[in-house]
Amino acid sequence: MSIFTKVLLATDGSEGAQRAVEIATGLSTKLESELYLVYVAREHPYLHAYHDLRHQEEEERFKSEDEQMLGESVKYVRKAGGAVTESYLRVGEAANEIVELAEELGVGLVVLGSNGRARIRRALMGSVSTSVLRHAHCSVLIARGYDPSSEHARPPGKILVAIDGSEEASAAARVTGEIAKATGSEAHLVYAMQEERYRPHLGPEMWEGWQEGFEHAKRSARSWVEGQAEHMRSERVKTVESHLLLGRPDAATVWLAEEIGAGLVVLGSRGLGGMKRILTGSVSDSVARHAHCPVMVVRKEMR
């Protein structure tokens, strides 16, 4: 049984959305998930203020263009070797419509582009993807920085998962393992230690033996990370590498993803802060904003 029985792909015809189509098609095919597609059209309030023939024709033209865009997206999925179970045309605020449809369908994963039609800097995400990431009931994959021609874009690529011992991170590791097995990708596990958590703050007399204690903590952490990697290998993931880094979890994850040429970063929805929602400034939110490649944020309960 697939880890995601249903995948919802949100598209708007932009370059970022085309990247999302490539990824959603590949994942749903490899994981044997049902793929649903939604195109959200903008409302045109001024049309509702008039009821003459000219504005009625204008409204019909917009609807025809939106239906054409939806149809083109379906064709693109099929051309990429995928199959669309059902497609939907919604009208309204994009993020709300995507989140509501995901809930209605009971999907396990939403895939969408990072910035819609606007060209913006790498450190920013579009308002739609940000809102969906924060409010969706399910896991979300932001297709940022994806290059279909890259050697890392298609399997065997490299998947980096950030772990910290939380239940959410464990769920992210399980998803990583399943995707790696299905696609033949390498799996990389990273745990980031924050040195300041171990450094004494009560005066020079407390520093005696601190370095020795910190080295012991690093050895224990390295052993734990390798143990997690070994567990993933026992689940028949062919290639698994473990990494221990010093620094903030978000910065360390973003750096390592670029260093190894990861094609996907996976992490849990809470991170180290114990937050119930993904909030601005959290590990998950920061990685989703700054990573060079697609980022999947996994909710603990998967469908």
Located regions from the model:
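Structural beta-alpha unit
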Residues: 1-3, 16, 75-110, 230-265, ...
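Intrinsically disordered or low-complexity boundary/linker segments at protein termini
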Residues: 1-19, 82, 109, 131-174, ...
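Gly/Ser-rich helix-loop-strand patches that form or flank binding pockets
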Residues: 3, 26-30, 95-149, 255-303
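Residues at the starts of beta-strands that form the adenosine-phosphate
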Residues: 6, 32-36, 84, 157-158, ...
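Short, well-ordered secondary-structure micro-motifs
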Residues: 20, 47-49, 123, 153, ...
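General small-molecule cofactor/ligand-binding pocket signal
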Residues: 36-38, 85-90, 141, 190, ...
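Acidic, proline/glycine-rich short linear motifs
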Residues: 39-68, 192-223, 303
